[in-house]
C-alpha cells in the first residue's frame, strides 16, 4: 500500500423452345460458353501484393505501437490514487507495472523527454509506417489532454466535503479512461488493428501526414 501511494472486442434442362401465349420464341441455349475476362500476370501479381500490403502489419510495428500507449498511462497514474487504494482488484492489476512506473517517475523531466522523443523521432519520421506514427501520435494527444484535469486540480484543491468528492470522481474518471485506453490500444495493436480513441483519433489523424 505504501508503494501504491507513491504514484498517483438437377435443375431441369432449359434448352428448347419457349412458347408464351401462342407465340414461339427463339431457342434458348444456356450451354453456350462465354470467354472469361483475363488479367495479365503482372496485373494479377500487383493486385495480390496491394491486398497483402493493406491487410498486414509488421510485428515490429505492432509492438512499437502497443508500447506507446503506456506513456500516457504512466504519466497520469497519479489520477488513480483514490481508486487504486480503495479497490484491491486495481492494485493487483497495476502491481506488475510498479517498477516501470517508478522508473518513469524517478526523474521529473522523463515525461517531457519521452514526449519530445516520440514526436520528433517517431511521428515526424517517414521511415516509420503510418500505422506506427498514428498510434504514437494518438498516445501523445492523450497525454496532452491530461493538462486540463491537472490545471483544474491546481486551481481547485479542496480538502474535504463536496469539493473533495468532485475531485475524487474526476480523478477516478480520468484514471479509468487512461486504463481503458491502454488496454484497448495495446490489445488492438498486438492484433494489427487500428484503435481509434474518442476525443483523440481525429486530432492524431490531422498530425500524421
Swiss-Prot record:
Residue ranges of the TM segments: 63-83, 103-123, 132-152, 173-193
Top-rank lineage group of the source organism: Eukaryota
Disulfide bonds: none
UniProt cross-references to InterPro entries, sorted A to Z: Tic20 (IPR005691)
Reported function: May be involved in protein precursor import into chloroplasts. Not redundant with TIC20-I, TIC20-II or TIC20-IV.
Any one GO cellular component localisation term in the record: chloroplast thylakoid membrane
Name of this protein: Protein TIC 20-v, chloroplastic
GO BP of this protein: protein transport
Subunit note: Part of the Tic complex.
Disruption phenotype: No visible phenotype.
Pfam families, per the entry: TIC20
Bilayer topology annotation: Multi-pass membrane protein
Protein family per UniProt: Belongs to the Tic20 family.
Tissue expression from the record: Expressed in leaves, siliques and roots.
Subcellular location: Plastid, Chloroplast inner membrane
Transit peptide start and end: 1-49
Keywords: Chloroplast, Membrane, Plastid, Plastid inner membrane, Protein transport, Transit peptide, Transmembrane, Transmembrane helix, Transport
Amino acid at each position: 500500500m505504501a508503494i501504491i501511494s507513491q504514484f498517483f472486442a438437377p435443375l431441369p434442362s432449359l434448352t428448347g423452345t419457349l412458347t408464351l401465349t401462342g407465340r414461339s420464341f427463339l431457342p434458348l441455349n444456356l450451354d453456350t460458353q462465354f470467354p472469361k475476362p483475363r488479367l495479365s500476370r503482372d496485373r494479377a501479381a500487383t493486385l495480390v501484393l496491394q491486398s497483402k500490403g493493406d491487410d498486414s502489419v509488421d510485428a515490429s510495428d505492432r509492438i512499437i505501437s502497443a508500447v506507446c500507449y503506456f506513456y500516457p498511462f504512466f504519466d497520469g497514474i497519479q489520477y488513480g490514487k483514490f481508486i487504486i487504494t480503495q479497490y484491491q482488484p486495481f492494485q493487483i492489476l497495476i502491481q506488475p507495472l510498479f517498477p516501470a512506473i517508478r522508473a518513469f517517475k524517478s526523474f521529473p523531466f522523463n515525461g517531457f523527454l519521452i514526449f519530445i522523443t516520440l514526436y520528433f523521432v517517431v511521428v515526424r519520421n517517414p521511415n516509420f509506417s503510418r500505422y506506427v506514427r498514428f498510434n504514437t501520435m494518438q498516445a501523445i494527444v492523450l497525454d496532452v489532454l491530461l493538462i486540463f484535469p491537472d490545471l483544474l486540480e491546481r486551481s481547485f484543491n479542496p480538502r474535504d466535503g463536496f469539493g473533495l468528492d468532485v475531485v475524487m470522481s474526476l480523478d477516478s474518471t480520468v484514471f479509468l479512461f487512461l486504463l481503458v485506453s491502454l488496454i484497448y490500444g495495446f490489445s488492438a495493436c498486438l492484433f494489427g488493428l487500428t484503435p481509434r480513441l474518442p476525443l483523440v483519433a481525429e486530432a492524431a489523424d490531422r498530425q500524421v501526414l
